[in-house]
Amino acid sequence: RRIMGDTIVPTIPIMVNTYYPPNQPTLNRCYELGRQIRAAVEALPGDARVGVIASGGLSHFVVDEEIDGITMKALREKDREALTSMPRERLNSGTSEIRNWIAMAGATEHLDHEWSDYVPSYRSKAGTGCGMGFGIWS
């Protein structure tokens, strides 16, 4: 509200079961979901400006800078193969939310990467915390 005031922004939340087996989607299915979201947006009448937001962390509850780095590099380079071939066993617990980023990659594959950053945010000496990714495609 601080930025938008009372402006109402139409929003369609799409929830992906990243966390609970046995029906977590495959990484390829997440990418395809993103492509279908893009197709639906492109089919809208008019010239509405649409934002796609992936929520969720990269790695957490234990920070995994390696898998976060693979993800961020693949997002920057539009490397679908790298995004969809990550080992599923690495995408457990909170790290499973990388699936949301993969869906976003499918929706934005036609856009140019402008900026991204990664901050590994540790909260304990045991390595717990969250890998925080940020990016802009337009």
Placement of each model-derived feature along the sequence:
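Phosphate/ribose-phosphate-bearing ligand recognition and processing surfaces
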Residues: 57-61
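Flexible, D/E/H-enriched segments
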Residues: 1-35, 40-43, 63-138
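Beta-strand elements within well-structured catalytic alpha/beta cores of enzymes
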Residues: 14, 48-56
